[in-house]
């Protein structure tokens, strides 16, 4: 075991001690994805980054990657759905709220994106940073049919739930391979130096 691997394992062990266990952990991941997708709240919560990190942790034994993906997808869907309902029910009134008023530029960007791409914007908008939570809100306010919204939102949430924790998982696998090959490469260089000296 290399020193770097030992330090990583010790750091992860300490981190795991602070994280909740079992169902509570998956609820936390679901809430993070929910918040990331909720109109306005997603600006404050780095849900994508946290879900990538959770995928990395799953590789190292913190929970099941499959359950993690499901929790992230379900949370993302419900955040979208609530944003859609808020847009349909309260659209302009909610935009008058002091906090959202400061983000009208993002609402306008979401409106333009929705006008250009229609229902597909619900699917693709999830992957466009700051406007992510505003797209479902705008779709609801624009009177998008709920059935069409649900189809795009379910597909988008499933892909997001798979992509972000999956990215963390595969980054961890790649990191392990880099560490393994770095160690071997170092030995080859050392052997070459010994032979030449």
Give residue spans per PLM region:
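Membrane-interfacial helix-loop-helix
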Residues: 1-31, 56-148, 172-190
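Transmembrane alpha-helix interface/packing and boundary motifs in multi-pass membrane proteins
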Residues: 30-49, 125
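Structural signal for membrane-spanning alpha-helices in multi-pass inner-membrane proteins
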Residues: 33, 37, 55-56, 164, ...
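Membrane-embedded alpha-helical segments of multi-pass transporters/permeases
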Residues: 41, 81-85, 161-165
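Hydrophobic alpha-helical segments within and immediately flanking transmembrane helices
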Residues: 49-57
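C-terminal membrane module of polytopic membrane proteins
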Residues: 155-197
């Amino acid at each position: 075991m290399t020193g770097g691997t030992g330090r990583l394992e010790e750091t992860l062990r300490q981190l795991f001690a602070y994280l909740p266990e079992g169902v509570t952990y998956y609820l936390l991941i679901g809430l993070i994805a929910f918040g990331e997708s909720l109109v306005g709240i997603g600006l404050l919560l780095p849900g994508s980054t946290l879900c990538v990190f959770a995928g990395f942790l799953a590789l190292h034994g913190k929970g099941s990657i499959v359950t993690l993906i499901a929790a992230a997808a379900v949370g993302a869907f419900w955040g979208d759905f609530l944003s859609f309902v808020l847009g349909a029910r309260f659209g302009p009134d909610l935009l008058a709220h002091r906090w959202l008023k400061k983000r009208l530029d993002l609402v306008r960007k979401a409106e333009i994106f929705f006008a250009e791409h229609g229902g597909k914007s619900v699917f693709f908008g999830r992957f466009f940073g700051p406007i992510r939570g505003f797209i479902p809100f705008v779709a609801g306010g624009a009177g998008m049919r709920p059935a069409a919204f649900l189809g795009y939102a379910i597909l988008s949430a499933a892909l997001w739930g798979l992509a972000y924790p999956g990215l963390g998982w595969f980054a961890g696998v790649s990191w392990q391979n880099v560490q393994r090959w770095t160690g071997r490469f170092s030995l080859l260089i050392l052997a070459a130096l010994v032979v030449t000296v």
